[in-house]
Amino acid sequence: MPTDLRQFDVIVLGAGAAGLMCAVVAGQRGRRVALLEHNGQPGRKILISGGGRCNFTNLHCGPENFHSENPHFAKSALALFQPRHFLELVERYGIAWHEKTLGQLFCDGSARTILDMLLEECERGGVEVVLNAREIAVEASSSGFRVSSSHGEFWAESLVVATGGLSIPKLGATGLGYELAAQFGLNVIAPRPALVPLVLGGDEAGWTELAGVAADVVAWAEPGFEKHPSGAKAQAHSAGSTYGLKPVPFKELKSVRFREKMLVTHRGLSGPAVLQASSYWRPGEALLLNFLPELAAQADLFDGLKQPGARRDLVALRRALREVLPQRLANYLAEIGGPKGWSNAALEECERRLRRWEFNPVGTEGFEKAEVTAGGVDTRELQARTMEALSAPGLFFIGEAVDVTGQLGGFNFQWAWASGVAAGRAV
């Protein structure tokens, strides 16, 4: 072996949440670890998450909170490293935290405390952190991996790819992980923006006049199929790059419903409910909203209008809607979704539509506004307990680079911690 190579047991590419956790676990096992990060500082997504307070996990985390071409893949890693395990580490450092809602755990103070904790744990494990390591190139041999970078050349028996996805490119997101997967012949599920605002156009563009209006709703995407033309390469949403992607078979998606807030924006729809549903939405499919989540299914919103002698007109309709919806939203829905006529049957049809209002988004706001990237390295290429590539011993993929995407609320961080621990114990 050439003597000019810096030799380690493990090289981790990417000092985000997953890469840091993997380096911590491997280093504290006594492995010599080099952690290479192309940015000038580690953990940039950690620092901005949760409005700067880091929604670092969710108490109610389970496999059902994730989606993937293989919904069973995440089970092993999530079982091995649970939210309580990360919380034990947080409490050991005396970091104050609180549960905000729906099991979401946040720091009382700055997200910086989580990053500092992980960096201190890296130091305890003797991890060498190399920042501004750019121009990465990887060569494999029978004994390990040679990584060339702007900071020189490194060699290790094991290589862990924790380079994340394409979301929030201003933080330095790249497609390196997908390129490395393609280099080693691994399939990649086409990356797409997830937890992302949706854009309205055409006949629905008028909704943007309500920008700033929020309401409690139930949101869901209709079940559909992820379509990739037979024999064609799936396209990534980044400058037309394919990253060597292969066709993905048709796969039916289940409908998952989310009851949270929606927000009308200057371009379309956002808010937690819509962000959640966006991960399950595909172009050409409908997004459905129930504007009456507080009203029992058997309740009659327009009972008052149906009484003998009751006023039945647009004014009365607006008044009824304002009892359950914000005024601007109630007025708009009355204008565009009011009954065709004022018979009881027409009022009942109007209520049914309010419980299942169909939008047809023209797209998303893209990776620039997406909180995470869905898709990634096909889990069929990886060993579920270790994250090791089945066809390339010593090569591991973890975190957002893998086709496992969590729902909003700390689940993606828990996947980062869990997949990082799984690989860190195996390298």
Q: How should each PLM-predicted stretch be described?
A:
Residues 11, 27-51:
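Glycine-rich FAD pyrophosphate-binding loop
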Residues 11-13, 36, 135, 154-170, ...:
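Short hydrophobic core segments
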Residues 4-18:
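Beta1/beta-strand and adjacent pyrophosphate-binding region of the FAD-binding site
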Residues 131-144:
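A conserved short coil-to-beta-strand element within the FAD-binding core of flavoproteins
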Residues 131, 331-405:
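A glycine-rich dinucleotide-binding beta-alpha-beta segment and adjacent secondary-structure elements
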Residues 6-8, 149-158, 257-259:
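Core beta-strand elements of the Rossmann-like FAD/NAD(P) dinucleotide-binding domain
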Residues 40-42, 47-48, 57-63, 96, ...:
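An anion/pyrophosphate-binding glycine-rich loop and adjacent beta-alpha core
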Residues 53-101:
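Glycine-rich active-site loop/strand segments that organize a redox cofactor
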